[in-house]
Amino acid sequence: MKQVFPNDWQEILADELEKTYYHTLRQFIANEYSTQTIYPPMQDVMNAFYTTAYQDVKVIILGQDPYHGPNQAHGLSFSVKPGIPHPPSLRNMLQELQDDLGCPIPQDGTLTKWAEQGVMLLNTVLTVRAGQANSHKDQGWEQFTDAVIDKLAAREEPLIFVLWGKPAQRKKQLICKHATPHVILEAPHPSPLSAYRGFFGSKPYSKINQQLVEWDKRPIDWCLA
């Protein structure tokens, strides 16, 4: 079987990579990249897995589909490439980070530092056509990322799942069917449409760190600037 991941995700997802739907999805994606402008760049699609190995995951922040503007998406949910203006949801996340932990708002909205510490930044759909939000919905990505969530929730070691907004919160059933007492943090989505309905003031970053300390795990250094 082709090596998709350079770490333990390869073994964890080996069965999934052999399933018919995944081969169909790969063909669809290959065709889209050859005929359309697709984000993120093909080499970045699996970045969430490359950057955070299965065994290293402590926290999962679930997003929806990638940013669909030029040079924004690079395979980590909510994150943008260096030098790119902060999209509104990310701007609100960084504002809450400042309010919660006093972290200065960084110039770059690149969240790789979080991912390298065990915060998996996973979108439920991993590709998108330029300028067309949700254009790769229902092509197979959801089945793949549901399997990822299921594999994470199956771990004996508890994790923290961060579910912002209704689509993310619908994944709760995948998490709760497992016996492991995972912690689920729910809040409205940080988008401008809902941030003032309870995302601001939800203090996710300090709550995550308090929980990690309770579990005798190293807290996340959230500050980016």
Swiss-Prot record:
It catalyses: Hydrolyzes single-stranded DNA or mismatched double-stranded DNA and polynucleotides, releasing free uracil. It comes from the Bacteria. GO terms for molecular function: uracil DNA N-glycosylase activity. It comes from Lysinibacillus sphaericus (strain C3-41). InterPro entries: UDG_fam1, Ura-DNA_Glyclase_AS, Uracil-DNA_glycosylase-like, Uracil-DNA_glycosylase-like_sf. It is found in: Cytoplasm. Its EC number is 3.2.2.27. SMART domains: UDG (SM00986), UreE_C (SM00987). Excises uracil residues from the DNA which can arise as a result of misincorporation of dUMP residues by DNA polymerase or due to deamination of cytosine. One of its GO terms (biological process) is base-excision repair, AP site formation via deaminated base removal. This is Uracil-DNA glycosylase. The keyword Cytoplasm applies. The keyword Hydrolase applies.
